């Protein structure tokens, strides 16, 4: 199964990001803007300018996983 097992920290970026970025670009944002290590086992969550899309970046111990979700209707609620 893909994804974390057990308890894991979830870190949410509060500002929208350029959704053309892939796993490496988002990992760089984790380092630069969140001042965190993208390979620490936490899940990092980003949203597009339109709040109907999110991407999650996660290091599973063997590589970087990139998960994406687009809502058909509605928007994700996001912290300010």
Stretch-by-stretch model annotation:
Residues 1-80:
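Polybasic/polar functional segments that serve as interface/processing modules
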């Amino acid at each position: 199964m893909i994804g974390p097992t057990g308890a894991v920290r979830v870190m949410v970026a509060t500002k929208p990001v350029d959704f053309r970025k892939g796993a490496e670009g988002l990992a760089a944002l984790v380092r630069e803007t969140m001042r965190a290590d993208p390979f620490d086992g936490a899940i990092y969550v980003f949203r597009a300018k339109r709040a109907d899309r999110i991407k999650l970046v996660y290091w599973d111990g063997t590589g970087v996983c990139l998960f994406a979700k687009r809502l058909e209707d509605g928007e994700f609620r996001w912290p300010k």
